[in-house]
């Protein structure tokens, strides 16, 4: 992407204040051509449905070379889905360490009232600034930590699936996930105080489990009976 290319930055009214405004400023300061897409939902929750996805497609000009998603689950999944279909790369600016889907190869969306998770491409880059993450609501931080705790049973379930169903098991992915979990658990005490190192370790664990899922093209490294 060069400075003459168009970058579409996508955010809602909440993530704009947290990180979107600064992201746009930084891009413009560095000479990039930027277009902004704001989902002004008020106090309502943005849904990754046909209306949301269609709006992103509508705002994607023909000379758009990159999208930047500023948010967490819904914003990331929506931009991931659209760019995977249009062939554009995208970058996610994480605003909360709340889930493991930032770099996973699925994009949960709603279609005709039903939720499903079509395959989508991976993000070109993930920005996880702890100065941004520490502003996330505590319940989202707790959700992310709960997601990490669930990986313990996910790995155990994977072992069981190998024995019971002769499933494929990737030792590299298991090692990757376990190391990330150990680091996160060692620093978990600091999450209640929004300690930057603890938040960084949490996002790293969530990110690496997403990477593990993408590597084996199944959810076993990160999801099981939990």
Model-derived regions, located:
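Active-site segments that bind and position negatively charged phosphate/pyrophosphate groups
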Residues: 172-226
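Hydrophobic beta-strand segments of well-ordered beta-sheets in folded domains
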Residues: 5-9, 124-126
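A glycine/threonine-rich phosphate-anchoring loop and its flanking beta-alpha core
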Residues: 81-183
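Solvent-exposed alpha-helices and their adjacent loops that cap or buttress functional pockets
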Residues: 59-62, 83, 116-121, 125, ...
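Alpha-helix capping and helix-loop boundary segments enriched in small/acidic/polar residues
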Residues: 40-47, 114-115, 136, 220
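Alpha-helical scaffold segments in soluble metabolic enzymes
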Residues: 22, 55, 59, 81, ...
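N-terminal small/polar loop signature for handling phosphorylated ligands or for N-terminal nucleophile
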Residues: 8, 13-91, 190-201
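Short, small-residue-biased leader/transition segments that mark boundaries at the very start
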Residues: 1-3
